[in-house]
């Protein structure tokens, strides 16, 4: 993939801004704690906020690393650890845990249905986790206050594909918008949150298609305000 130079610079500038802001917040919060400006009973709350900011920053940097790895001739192992077993409910729970605290601030929950069935595929759990983290991040950012993000997974009988469906009420997007495109953010989303890299969902598509040989899609129903993401991964089995 060869990107227009001006567009690349704009993307990197925006990305850098998204990384620096949380780190500045972390440094400011730590200074306030160390200087004794934060009451002792408020320190745990502030530390959880710091952890959330650091998790966001790490996720952004991982997205950039995946973007470089899967769109260039960057000399990296593109399919490392792909012989591992990805237990889908376990990876979903791990990914969701990063956004539970952030979601609570707006009354948004993440719930996995039917977690008892251990559907699985062969692949790298860390890479699949990043896909789910990006989608949960999107859901928490643009979800409606007090809504629930529901996650279901099952194995389709005729194809053997594992299907992961993530649904929740949220700010929508138009059908003509390719929200998985590089640097693309829905018009309605930009009205709610001005900042954003436009990289997370693009990385989801790169990983699902290029690493797992699967498919990812999304749709929004304006009448019900329901946004759904569907991930299809071949080679499903029950662990």
Where are these regions (language model features)?
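Conserved catalytic submotifs in the C-terminal HATPase_c
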Residues: 109-119
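Glycine-rich ATP-binding loops of the HATPase_c
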Residues: 212-220
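Conserved micro-motifs of the catalytic ATP-binding
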Residues: 72-81, 120-123
């Amino acid at each position: 993939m060869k990107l227009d130079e001006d567009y690349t610079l704009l993307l990197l500038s925006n990305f850098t801004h998204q990384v620096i802001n949380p780190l500045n917040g972390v440094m400011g919060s730590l200074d306030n704690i160390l200087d004794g400006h934060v009451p002792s009973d408020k320190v745990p709350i502030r530390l959880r906020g710091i952890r959330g900011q650091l998790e966001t920053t790490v996720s952004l940097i991982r997205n950039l690393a995946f973007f470089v790895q899967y769109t260039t001739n960057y000399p990296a192992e593109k399919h490392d650890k792909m012989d591992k077993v990805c237990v889908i409910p376990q990876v979903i729970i791990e990914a969701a845990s990063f956004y539970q605290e952030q979601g609570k601030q707006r009354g948004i929950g993440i719930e996995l249905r039917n977690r008892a069935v251990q559907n699985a595929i062969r692949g790298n759990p860390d890479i699949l986790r990043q896909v789910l983290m990006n989608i949960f991040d999107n859901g928490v950012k643009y979800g409606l206050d007090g809504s629930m993000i529901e996650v279901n997974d099952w194995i389709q009988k005729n194809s053997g594909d594992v299907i992961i469906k993530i649904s929740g009420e949220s700010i929508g997007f138009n059908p003509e918008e390719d929200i998985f495109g590089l640097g693309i953010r829905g018009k309605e989303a930009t009205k709610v949150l001005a900042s954003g890299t436009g990289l997370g969902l693009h990385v989801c598509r790169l990983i699902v298609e290029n690493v797992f040989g699967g498919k990812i899609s999304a749709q929004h129903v304006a009448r019900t305000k329901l946004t759904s993401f569907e991930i299809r991964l071949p080679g499903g089995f029950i662990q």
